[in-house]
């Protein structure tokens, strides 16, 4: 067929160009044309086998993936009645993981559409959990483990489950040929990758790296690439900004089979997916122990905290929309090995979620994570990350809790970093003007054995003091731990301030806050740290109007620190002390208006007394300021009159602004000459008096100019002469130029006239010659 086409083309060339083109020029043209045609056909033929090969590989991958997912779905769905799986609304992205109460879960993470942090969520229950998802959520693993890895590792050690979740966005089920109970979750597809690792590898996790490196694709080393469907838009796009998540205890390159390509190469083929990702960095002293229910309640190193925050109405910008919503949890990006905190961003969730024990709760319920501390002595474990769903209200609350042992205050001060308790430097940076930025930890519960019961949406400050009192009695008296509990969360609008820089940690004996200008007086009280809970209660409404700060002492007196009503809004920070000898001074930066909500224990009386004292002080200050202003005005008037008199001291005639027609400076009012004043007001002024006054004014103005100008006044004459000389030189140069131009033009004109005259003479002579010749 190819030869026939080539011969036909050659014959057509011979027919069209038999005479015009010679054979030496025809042959190279035909050869070039045929080679181009042959190359196009050859590339097309080579492309067909590749397409067929790709389609067969894709079909094989789909079949294998459907088989694996059916087996995993049977295992996961079998636990669904136990944990009461409940689907979420498809509008808000959220991944919720649950387990038994004695199993430490590591992360509950949610994904914001706007955030572009690459990342992953790692879960470590001892039994498989139930996962549900909607909208793009990306986790550590993209694929399912290979059977060779399962066989190799199951033959050596006893198995424990490490759940690695992957949720991808798709309006329908992941594969249309899936069977069984998985089709009931077709609107929220999810792939649960179950990797069997050894129990010994959990201890090995302490020294391994769990980090995120940019400029590589997300890959879990020993996962086969055949389980990825490269044609469907659910597969995650592996671009340069995506981070690599290396799971500890699993070699990412050693167990890779040679006939399988890397998952990142397969994922790179997809250019359609736009999913948002999270980076969850886990400290390296983390996944070590698995406490039982008894050890959770009895061991001093394990903290169980269940807390909920009431709904807080969000504060938005004027140009707010869904793409610009930003929660309070704004801070520095998480770093590898960070023991102090975990940063998360959340999109407002909708719908209901599962509680910690698996029972269905209201939309304001919470999903709580319990974490066992690490093996490293004295170092604390990362606390609880808690995501509160506030129903249809678009204001999520992120709660970070930091648990630590009594040893940790002295050994690792970075753990007790409370970003609402800075020392003098950070406090000054965060409270000047409107530049108030709340850190990502909006609620803390660092008590060792406390468990705050879940509250409804309306409870804000009523029952907190009783719970604090009970928690104080139940706390161990030998552990000097500063406890900050249930601080009301505050929503800060986007762009209202700059992020706080360098929040220092709370040392075992904190320094006194040195900002004396922020408060008129500080209330000091001694607090024994072994048995006293020193809370910091903040309530800030959506319009930033009400701000109240109280300190609870041993006698349980509330000492409010109030600000003036006209000052800009700022945060109120209390610095509690641990030692009983050091007093605690309350420093407040003023708020917009006085609080209209009062707590218990006679707060209204104290507040009214404070208000009266403040009003008295303000009145006294106002009177003093008015007196000072009057004195300043009198001084200025005296100075003006003195200067006028000085100007006219040299004048023999009556000086100053006397009325026209009156010769004396002071009219004789005492003698009853009021008629003279009335006549003087209508008298035409004499010219001599006006001239004298004008001369005095001009003389005073000249003296003032000389005094102010100083030595510059003596330079006016030479500067003027220099400027005049420069202008004269420029004028002379210009005039010379103009004269030369005129001379040149005149010379040209003269030449032109002479040439014309010569030509006329030549013409006349030629005519004469020609006429002579004719005759």
UniProtKB/Swiss-Prot annotation:
Residues 48-715 are extracellular. Expressed in bone-marroew cells. Residues 737-775 are cytoplasmic. Glycans are attached at residues 76, 476. The chain crosses the membrane at residues 716-736. Residues 129-142, 577-599 have a biased composition (Polar residues). Residues 120-148, 247-273, 324-366, 559-669 are annotated as: Disordered. Pfam families: ARMH4 (PF15767). One of its GO terms (biological process) is regulation of TORC2 signaling. Residues 606-640 have a biased composition (Acidic residues). Keywords: Glycoprotein, Membrane, Phosphoprotein, Signal, Transmembrane, Transmembrane helix. Residues 1-47 form the signal peptide. May modulate immune response and may play a role in inflammation. Down-modulates STAT3 signaling throught direct interaction with IL6ST, resulting in the inhibition of phosphorylation of STAT3 at 'Tyr-705'. May negatively regulates AKT signaling by modulating the activity of mTORC2 complex through RICTOR interaction. This is Armadillo-like helical domain-containing protein 4. It comes from Mus musculus (Mouse).
């Amino acid at each position: 067929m190819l030869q026939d086409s080539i011969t036909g083309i050659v014959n057509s060339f011979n027919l069209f160009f038999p005479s015009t083109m010679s054979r030496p020029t025809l042959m190279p043209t035909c050869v070039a044309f045929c080679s181009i045609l042959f190359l196009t056909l050859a590339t097309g033929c080579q492309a067909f086998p590749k397409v067929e090969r790709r389609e067969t590989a894709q079909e094989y991958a789909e079949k294998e993936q459907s088989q694996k997912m059916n087996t995993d779905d049977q295992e996961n769905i079998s636990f669904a009645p136990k944990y009461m799986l409940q689907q979420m609304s498809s509008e808000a992205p959220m991944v919720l993981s649950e387990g038994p109460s004695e199993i430490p879960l590591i992360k509950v993470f949610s994904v914001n559409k706007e955030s572009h942090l690459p990342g992953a969520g790692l879960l470590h229950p001892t039994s498989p959990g139930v996962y549900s998802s909607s909208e793009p959520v990306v986790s550590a693993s993209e694929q399912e483990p290979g059977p060779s890895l399962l066989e190799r590792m199951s033959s050596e050690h006893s198995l424990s489950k490490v759940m690695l979740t992957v949720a991808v966005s798709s309006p329908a089920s992941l594969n249309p040929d899936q069977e069984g109970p998985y089709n009931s979750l077709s609107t929220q597809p999810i792939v649960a990758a179950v990797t069997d690792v050894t129990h010994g590898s959990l201890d090995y996790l302490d020294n391994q790296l769990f980090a995120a490196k940019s400029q590589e694709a997300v890959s879990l080393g020993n996962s086969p690439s055949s389980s990825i469907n490269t044609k469907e838009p659910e597969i995650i796009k592996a671009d340069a900004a995506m981070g690599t998540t290396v799971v500890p205890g699993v070699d990412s390159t050693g167990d890779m089979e040679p006939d399988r390509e890397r998952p990142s190469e397969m994922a790179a083929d997809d250019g359609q997916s736009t999913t948002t990702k999270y980076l969850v960095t886990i400290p390296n002293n983390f996944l070590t122990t698995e406490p039982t229910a008894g050890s959770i309640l009895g061991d001093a190193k394990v903290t169980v905290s269940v807390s909920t925050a009431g709904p807080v109405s969000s504060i938005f910008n004027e140009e707010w929309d869904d793409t610009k919503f930003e929660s309070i949890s704004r801070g520095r990006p998480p770093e590898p090995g960070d023991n102090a905190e975990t940063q998360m961003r959340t999109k407002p969730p909708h719908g209901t979620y599962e509680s910690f024990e698996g029972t269905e709760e209201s939309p304001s319920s919470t999903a709580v994570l319990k974490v066992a501390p690490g093996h490293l002595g004295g170092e604390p474990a990362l606390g609880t990350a808690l995501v509160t769903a506030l129903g249809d209200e678009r204001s999520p609350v992120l709660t970070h809790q930091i648990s630590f042992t009594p040893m940790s205050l002295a050994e690792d001060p970075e753990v007790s970093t409370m970003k609402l308790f800075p020392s003098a430097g950070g406090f000054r940076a965060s409270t000047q003007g409107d530049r108030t930025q709340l850190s990502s930890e909006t609620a803390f519960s660092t008590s060792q054995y406390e468990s705050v019961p879940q509250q409804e949406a309306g409870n804000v400050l009523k029952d907190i003091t009783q719970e604090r009192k009970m928690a104080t009695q139940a706390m161990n008296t030998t552990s000097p731990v500063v406890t900050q509990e249930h601080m009301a969360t505050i929503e800060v609008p986007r762009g209202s301030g700059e992020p706080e820089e360098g929040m220092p940690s709370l040392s075992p004996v904190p320094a006194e806050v040195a900002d004396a200008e922020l408060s008129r007086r500080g209330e000091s009280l001694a607090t024994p740290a072994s048995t006293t809970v020193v809370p910091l209660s903040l309530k800030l409404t959506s319009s930033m109007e009400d701000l109240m700060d109280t300190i609870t002492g041993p006698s349980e007196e509330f000492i409010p620190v109030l600000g003036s009503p006209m000052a800009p809004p700022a945060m109120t920070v209390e610095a509690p002390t641990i030692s009983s000898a050091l007093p605690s001074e309350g420093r407040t930066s003023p708020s917009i208006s006085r609080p209209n909500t009062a707590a218990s224990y006679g707060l209204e009386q104290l507040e009214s007394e404070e208000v009266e004292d403040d009003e008295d002080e303000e009145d006294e200050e106002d009177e003093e300021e008015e007196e000072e202003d009057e004195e300043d005005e009198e001084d200025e008037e005296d100075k003006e009159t003195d200067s006028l008199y000085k100007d006219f001291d040299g004048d023999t005639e009556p000086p100053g602004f006397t009325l026209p027609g009156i010769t004396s400076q002071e009219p004789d009012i005492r003698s009853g000459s009021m008629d003279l004043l009335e006549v003087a007001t209508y008298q035409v002024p004499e010219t001599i008096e006006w001239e004298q006054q004008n001369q005095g004014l001009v003389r005073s103005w000249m003296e003032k100019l000389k005094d102010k100008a100083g030595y510059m006044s003596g330079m006016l004459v030479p500067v003027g002469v220099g400027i005049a000389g420069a202008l004269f030189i420029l004028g002379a140069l210009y005039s010379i130029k103009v004269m030369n131009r005129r001379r040149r033009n005149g010379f040209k004109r003269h030449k032109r006239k002479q040439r014309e005259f010569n030509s006329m003479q030549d013409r006349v002579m030629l005519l004469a010659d020609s006429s002579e010749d004719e005759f």
